[in-house]
């Protein structure tokens, strides 16, 4: 049983749980917290729904045997969380203070909201090349997830951009579907581990194009080609591909909390053991903000469920001692 509600100076109720972020992790955390009668306040952000909002077809999410579009899946998750009483707001979070029994969250309109527990589910963003045509054709031939979209390029010629383990793994995986894969890298040396590089080099379907940078992605409604430039000669050529997979890494959206909680050298939030607990009591993290390995909708949803359960248990344990109900320990929001 959680502590009774109190109100802050601006008459906002102090919540049991605030969820920051949407997508599969955030919405699932909201659903489970709502069903546990925690009345979660969820800040989805103005760009809600996460990376799946740019995914045209999702065929590997359990329960949808005929597939579903990314936006449709997010809408279903969102509506399900609403059905059970989650308070969803399309507002961006400006700053947070996560120390002490009461956590504070400041939104872009300057309003301060407080809660006894916070679930972080801001996700991670794929790094992109920022060249003409790339963002315009995202989800229409340009992708950052071979596992998600590789199937749609069966018997087609595609390109993978990158030189690390992720690029080698994506290229190798895509040979299951594609007729050919051209791996484009700006140098002739690779950051990839030897075993991953050798695996790609020994695959007859993979062609290496080194010392080339991407100039633009061609196409009006779908990808029709990839323009590249030779870094030695400056000559430009166009690769006749219908798919472009960008594999130059991901950036966890942890900037909001990076100075407050423990993160790894790349900015992924660290959790304790098999839980979703972070280095701060009452603060939990889920989804791609934590997961640098799988980055799938179903795994993100699972960790969102775990975060809500962890938060519920933590609140129940601390309500008995009154630790989760102190209004004197609020540390002002850091701007």
UniProtKB/Swiss-Prot annotation:
<keyword id="KW-1015">Disulfide bond</keyword>
<comment type="subunit">
    <text>Homodimer.</text>
</comment>
<keyword id="KW-0521">NADP</keyword>
<feature type="binding site">
    <location>
        <position position="166"/>
    </location>
    <ligand>
        <name>NADP(+)</name>
    </ligand>
</feature>
<feature type="binding site">
    <location>
        <begin position="295"/>
        <end position="298"/>
    </location>
    <ligand>
        <name>FAD</name>
    </ligand>
</feature>
<dbReference type="GO" id="GO:0045454">
    <property type="term" value="P:cell redox homeostasis"/>
</dbReference>
<dbReference type="InterPro" id="IPR008255">
    <property type="entry name" value="Pyr_nucl-diS_OxRdtase_2_AS"/>
</dbReference>
<keyword id="KW-0560">Oxidoreductase</keyword>
<feature type="modified residue" description="N-acetylthreonine">
    <location>
        <position position="2"/>
    </location>
</feature>
<feature type="binding site">
    <location>
        <position position="60"/>
    </location>
    <ligand>
        <name>FAD</name>
    </ligand>
</feature>
<keyword id="KW-0285">Flavoprotein</keyword>
<dbReference type="InterPro" id="IPR036188">
    <property type="entry name" value="FAD/NAD-bd_sf"/>
</dbReference>
<keyword id="KW-0007">Acetylation</keyword>
<feature type="binding site">
    <location>
        <position position="248"/>
    </location>
    <ligand>
        <name>NADP(+)</name>
    </ligand>
</feature>
<dbReference type="GO" id="GO:0019430">
    <property type="term" value="P:removal of superoxide radicals"/>
</dbReference>
<feature type="modified residue" description="Phosphotyrosine; by PtkA">
    <location>
        <position position="32"/>
    </location>
</feature>
<dbReference type="InterPro" id="IPR050097">
    <property type="entry name" value="Ferredoxin-NADP_redctase_2"/>
</dbReference>
<keyword id="KW-0963">Cytoplasm</keyword>
<feature type="binding site">
    <location>
        <begin position="44"/>
        <end position="51"/>
    </location>
    <ligand>
        <name>FAD</name>
    </ligand>
</feature>
<dbReference type="GO" id="GO:0015035">
    <property type="term" value="F:protein-disulfide reductase activity"/>
</dbReference>
<feature type="binding site">
    <location>
        <position position="295"/>
    </location>
    <ligand>
        <name>NADP(+)</name>
    </ligand>
</feature>
<feature type="binding site">
    <location>
        <position position="288"/>
    </location>
    <ligand>
        <name>FAD</name>
    </ligand>
</feature>
<feature type="binding site">
    <location>
        <position position="268"/>
    </location>
    <ligand>
        <name>NADP(+)</name>
    </ligand>
</feature>
<protein>
    <recommendedName>
        <fullName>Thioredoxin reductase</fullName>
        <ecNumber>1.8.1.9</ecNumber>
    </recommendedName>
</protein>
<keyword id="KW-0274">FAD</keyword>
<dbReference type="InterPro" id="IPR005982">
    <property type="entry name" value="Thioredox_Rdtase"/>
</dbReference>
<dbReference type="GO" id="GO:0004791">
    <property type="term" value="F:thioredoxin-disulfide reductase (NADPH) activity"/>
</dbReference>
<keyword id="KW-0676">Redox-active center</keyword>
<dbReference type="InterPro" id="IPR023753">
    <property type="entry name" value="FAD/NAD-binding_dom"/>
</dbReference>
<comment type="function">
    <text>Essential thiol-reducing enzyme that protects the cell from thiol-specific oxidizing stress. Plays a minor role in defense against oxidative and nitrosative stress. Is essential to establish and maintain infection in mice.</text>
</comment>
<dbReference type="GO" id="GO:0005829">
    <property type="term" value="C:cytosol"/>
</dbReference>
<comment type="similarity">
    <text>Belongs to the class-II pyridine nucleotide-disulfide oxidoreductase family.</text>
</comment>
<dbReference type="GO" id="GO:0050660">
    <property type="term" value="F:flavin adenine dinucleotide binding"/>
</dbReference>
<keyword id="KW-0597">Phosphoprotein</keyword>
<feature type="binding site">
    <location>
        <position position="185"/>
    </location>
    <ligand>
        <name>NADP(+)</name>
    </ligand>
</feature>
<feature type="disulfide bond" description="Redox-active">
    <location>
        <begin position="145"/>
        <end position="148"/>
    </location>
</feature>
<dbReference type="GO" id="GO:0001666">
    <property type="term" value="P:response to hypoxia"/>
</dbReference>
<feature type="binding site">
    <location>
        <begin position="22"/>
        <end position="25"/>
    </location>
    <ligand>
        <name>FAD</name>
    </ligand>
</feature>
<dbReference type="Pfam" id="PF07992">
    <property type="entry name" value="Pyr_redox_2"/>
</dbReference>
<feature type="binding site">
    <location>
        <position position="191"/>
    </location>
    <ligand>
        <name>NADP(+)</name>
    </ligand>
</feature>
<dbReference type="GO" id="GO:0070402">
    <property type="term" value="F:NADPH binding"/>
</dbReference>
<feature type="binding site">
    <location>
        <position position="93"/>
    </location>
    <ligand>
        <name>FAD</name>
    </ligand>
</feature>
